[in-house]
Amino acid sequence: MSIDSKTSKAMARLIKNVTVHTLWIYVLAILARGATYPYQVKKKIKEMFHFNPPTVTLYTVMYRLEKEGLIRKAENGSYEITEDGKAALKKASDTLRNLSETLDHIWYNLYKL
């Protein structure tokens, strides 16, 4: 997802909302696959989800996730998801799935007219 000069302001806000503002979900999804280091989290987000979050933003998000008990830092500097983190990831996934179904319903009814 990229923003260029032809991207409307509304679309730019949407892209930011589903990438940077929900970065914590991407971090938890990566860590759900196994413990890893922050620089690897950034690399995997770029590879898997096709956006490149600012490094300082990623570290801030990971710091907050750790403070909330959703991830924990190991002695070697890697991070892993906690049970609370897994529950939060599931709830976020369910919430986004419900939103997607609602949007599908809207589109179906819009084009049905």
Question: What kind of feature is each model-predicted range?
Answer:
Residues 44, 61, 106:
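Short acidic/histidine-centered micro-motifs embedded in hydrophobic/aromatic stretches
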Residues 66-74:
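A short, conserved structural fragment
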Residues 2-4, 56, 109-113:
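Exposed, interaction-prone assembly regions rather than primary DNA-binding/catalytic cores
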Residues 58-60, 64-65:
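Basic amphipathic alpha-helical segments that dock to polyanions
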